[in-house]
Design a protein with these regions (language model features):
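Domain-level detector for secreted/extracellular nuclease and nuclease-toxin modules, and
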Residues: 1-237
Length: 237
């Protein structure tokens, strides 16, 4: 196991902002929280807080991908990906968790990966991850929620039938209470040279596509203010 029970509170994916789980399988690690979907053999969402002090560039040795001991049904074996032509795409990026060996290693649970086209993973998806780090440097603490859109009839890989999402989402939030600002991105799982702004959508739209209520513990007024429209002007691209 890569997790240390003693540090689980360091996760601080503020519990008041955690999404709903459509599966009831919420798993807390030391530095991120996820909701696992057994039928799709991956997380429907991964949520974590990114702080400026997390933004280090320490060299870390990549560990092996291992099954998540906290997922009751066991997460998929990494060998499902072998020979599939798809990358083991991190949801919580290893690059956001270089500040400690444990935090870094924890991103190598197979509950934190999803089959991604290599050009997408190394291309526009990587650009978005880098932009999130840029925003953290500029604005301070961010809450990040990310996952594939898990639908019926997706292509599957491996003996355990790991689903291959056709699109991915990422929600980034900063600020507290009435000062909160959030962006939602929804992008097809293929490389694109388009600017990231082209993939901005209201968070409401991501909720419709996924069936997830992203800020379920917040008031309806707060949710409709944050989720109903795109407010890209509040963020520097």
């Amino acid at each position: 196991t890569y997790s240390d029970p003693a540090t689980s509170k360091a996760n601080v994916a503020a519990s008041g902002f955690l999404p709903s789980s459509t599966t009831g399988e919420i798993v807390e690690h030391s530095y991120y929280t996820l909701s696992y979907s057994e039928p799709h053999e991956q997380a429907e969402w991964v949520a974590y807080t990114l702080k400026q002090e997390h933004l280090t560039y320490d060299d870390r040795e990549r560990p092996y991908f291992i099954e998540d001991p906290k997922v009751s049904t066991k997460s998929a074996d990494w060998r499902n990906y072998r020979g599939s032509g798809y990358d083991r795409g991190h949801l919580c990026p290893a690059g956001d968790r270089r500040f400690s060996e444990q935090a870094y290693n924890e991103t190598f649970y197979t509950s934190n990966i999803s089959p991604q086209d290599r050009d997408f993973n190394a291309g526009i998806w990587n650009r978005l991850e880098q932009k999130v780090r840029y925003w953290c440097k500029k604005y301070g603490d961010l809450m990040v929620i990310t996952g594939g859109v898990l639908e019926n009839d997706l292509l599957e890989i491996g003996d355990e039938h790991v689903d291959v999402p056709k699109s991915y989402y990422k929600i980034v939030m900063r600020g507290k209470a009435k000062e909160a600002r959030a962006l939602g991105f929804l992008m097809p799982a293929k490389e694109s040279q388009q600017p990231l702004e082209q993939f901005l959508v209201p968070i409401d739209e991501i909720e419709k596509r996924t069936g997830i209520d992203f800020f379920e513990k917040q008031s309806q007024d707060w949710q409709s203010n944050i989720e109903s429209e795109v407010k890209g002007r509040d963020w520097k691209f």
